[in-house]
């Protein structure tokens, strides 16, 4: 297997996705608060300003957006990008790496001065560091007022009120499963692409990872609830849906059994990711579907069939492999071999020959030898990965891997990482260059940040494209002729037949 066939092409032919279920009406969403755009919300003047800083993954970005929705709706707060003028300051944290965790306390130290000038500023810490550290955060930084986990962000209004009434810090890092989604305001679109969380947590317990301990085990949102949220977003002009989960392809959403008889058999008790993708594809206005992040163990034949049958499913897959060495994969408790990983990619490319594959790699895992690293490099050559997130192993307290002996010098780890990144960057650059002259379907997201007179969007394989165009194209899928490949983006022009 090689990576020489993964240049995306325009006009893929796939079978039509089968009809599935009646789509939900948008007004069935569970909510306990008015939408910020509703007249009932507009009657309330702003009661202060809210600043949110986000560290980490796309799940955290999604959660931060929901924090903003909750507090701008229920508390009539106004968002600001300046913490010095905020009445409530929240930091949504990541604990996947040690440096990310220390950054949190450095940031909190800088905000401490904002509470010394007589202003009643509330500082809150959410996310995975909050789940991991809990009340230790308040002990280390006693000026922190709120500590809340990813599953309790919907309780922020109550926590803020309790903090003001009781004049003491509030800590809630419990795991109330999927409760938070029933208490969030109506989803609010901010552009033509939107994230939708379909599950929380992870039950794989990889030896290096803190996610099961900070976000809990896997819990999937009910099938109809996910479709209802997407229905709301579709009415607001969203054209692309990004499905989120720590282990998104382990999705098992409960389905409403409904009436059944001999001629109308009951649906299965749950929907997997493949079935969910097919259902989303029934929304006429949704032109592209993505999902992240996946686990190779859960990359099923059902998902391969969705790639075969659903043209709206983007021609790109991010599938973290972490290592090409079976010995290291076993120590990581990943549950698969390099050969099994390649077999899954082979099945996928049988139905999508030009799909681009990106991945994650951990370099310098305890005990990694030169031979182990060379097996990783061979896997990279065999697959032809297009882009990666690659890091030197970071020891996380409380994980099984933290007890493993590590005798590899840091200098060797850095050299290996640079070598790996150099090769993957070369593969990615080659793919970008081979896209010159092709026509790509691009979702126009808005004005280019580098040149406001141009537009920007993304190809199916996640490459930003900048091109001249009229603002009326924003929010539409258009064909773009690629004219130039730069280091981190492409340039093009609107394609006309």
UniProtKB/Swiss-Prot annotation:
Keywords from the named record: 4Fe-4S, Cytoplasm, Iron, Iron-sulfur, Metal-binding, S-adenosyl-L-methionine, Transferase, tRNA processing
Cofactor: [4Fe-4S] cluster
Region named Disordered: 1-48
KW Transferase (keyword) present: yes
Record-linked SUPFAM superfamilies: Radical SAM enzymes
GO cellular component, one term: cytosol
Known EC number: 2.8.4.3
Domain MTTase N-terminal: 48-165
Biased composition (Low complexity): 18-28
Domain Radical SAM core: 188-430
Main location, first listed in the record: cytoplasm
Domain of life: Bacteria
Signal found in the keyword field: no
A Pfam family assignment: TRAM
Reactions catalysed according to its record: N(6)-dimethylallyladenosine(37) in tRNA + (sulfur carrier)-SH + AH2 + 2 S-adenosyl-L-methionine = 2-methylsulfanyl-N(6)-dimethylallyladenosine(37) in tRNA + (sulfur carrier)-H + 5'-deoxyadenosine + L-methionine + A + S-adenosyl-L-homocysteine + 2 H(+)
Molecular function terms from GO: 4 iron, 4 sulfur cluster binding; metal ion binding; N6-isopentenyladenosine methylthiotransferase activity
Locations listed in the record: Cytoplasm
Domain TRAM as annotated: residue spans: 433-496
Residues that bind [4Fe-4S] cluster 1: 57, 94, 128
Annotated cofactor note: Binds 2 [4Fe-4S] clusters. One cluster is coordinated with 3 cysteines and an exchangeable S-adenosyl-L-methionine.
Binding site for [4Fe-4S] cluster 2: 202, 206, 209
Family in the record: Belongs to the methylthiotransferase family. MiaB subfamily.
Chain's role: Catalyzes the methylthiolation of N6-(dimethylallyl)adenosine (i(6)A), leading to the formation of 2-methylthio-N6-(dimethylallyl)adenosine (ms(2)i(6)A) at position 37 in tRNAs that read codons beginning with uridine.
Family annotation (PANTHER family): CDK5 REGULATORY SUBUNIT-ASSOCIATED PROTEIN 1, MITOCHONDRIAL TRNA METHYLTHIOTRANSFERASE CDK5RAP1
Subunit structure: Monomer.
Name this protein carries in UniProt: tRNA-2-methylthio-N(6)-dimethylallyladenosine synthase
Organism annotation: Xylella fastidiosa (strain Temecula1 / ATCC 700964)
Gene designation per UniProt: miaB
């Amino acid at each position: 297997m090689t990576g020489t066939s993964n240049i995306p092409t325009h006009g893929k032919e796939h079978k039509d996705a089968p009809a599935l279920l009646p789509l939900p009406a948008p007004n069935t969403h569970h909510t306990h608060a008015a939408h910020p755009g509703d007249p009932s919300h507009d009657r309330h003047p702003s009661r202060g300003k809210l600043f949110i800083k986000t560290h980490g993954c796309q799940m955290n970005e999604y959660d931060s957006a929901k924090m903003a929705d909750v507090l701008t709706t229920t508390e009539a707060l106004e968002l600001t990008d300046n913490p010095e003028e905020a009445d409530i300051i929240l930091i949504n944290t990541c604990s996947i790496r040690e440096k990310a965790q220390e950054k949190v306390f450095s940031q909190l130290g800088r905000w401490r001065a904002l509470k010394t000038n007589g202003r009643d500023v509330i500082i809150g810490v959410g996310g995975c560091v909050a789940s991991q550290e809990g009340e230790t955060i308040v002990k280390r930084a006693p000026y922190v007022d709120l500590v809340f986990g990813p599953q309790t962000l919907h309780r922020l209004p109550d926590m803020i009120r309790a903090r003001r009434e009781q004049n003491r810090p509030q800590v809630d890092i419990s795991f109330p499963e999927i409760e938070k989604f029933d208490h969030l305001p109506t989803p609010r679109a901010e552009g033509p692409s939107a994230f939708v969380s379909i599950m929380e947590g992870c039950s794989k317990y990889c030896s290096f990872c803190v996610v099961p301990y900070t976000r809990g085990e896997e819990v999937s949102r009910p099938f109809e609830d996910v479709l209802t949220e997407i229905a709301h977003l579709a009415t607001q002009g969203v054209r692309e849906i990004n499905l989120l989960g720590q282990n998104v392809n382990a999705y098992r959403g409960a389905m409403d059994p409904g009436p059944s008889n001999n001629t109308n058999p009951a649906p299965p008790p749950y929907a997997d990711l493949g079935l969910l993708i097919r259902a989303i594809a029934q929304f006429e206005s949704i032109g592209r579907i993505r999902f992240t992040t996946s686990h190779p163990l859960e990359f099923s034949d059902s998902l391969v069939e969705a790639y075969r049958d659903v043209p709206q499913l983007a021609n790109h897959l991010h599938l973290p492999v972490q290592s090409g060495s079976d010995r290291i994969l076993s120590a990581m408790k990943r549950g698969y071999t390099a050969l099994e990983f390649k077999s899954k990619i082979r099945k996928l490319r049988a139905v999508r020959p030009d799909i681009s594959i990106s991945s994650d790699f951990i370099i310098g895992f305890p005990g990694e030898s030169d031979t182990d690293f060379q097996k990783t490099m061979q896997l990279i050559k065999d697959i032809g990965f297009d882009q990666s997130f690659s890091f030197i192993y970071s020891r996380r307290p409380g994980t099984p891997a933290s007890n493993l002996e590590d005798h590899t010098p840091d200098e060797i780890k850095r050299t290996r990482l640079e070598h790996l990144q150099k090769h993957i960057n070369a593969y990615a650059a080659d793919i970008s260059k081979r896209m010159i002259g092709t026509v790509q379907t691009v979702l126009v997201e808005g004005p280019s940040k580098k040149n406001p007179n141009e537009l920007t969007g993304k190809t199916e394989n996640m490459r930003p494209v900048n091109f001249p165009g009229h603002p009326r194209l924003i929010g539409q899928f258009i064909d773009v002729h690629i004219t130039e490949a730069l280091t981190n983006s492409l340039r093009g022009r609107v394609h006309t037949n």
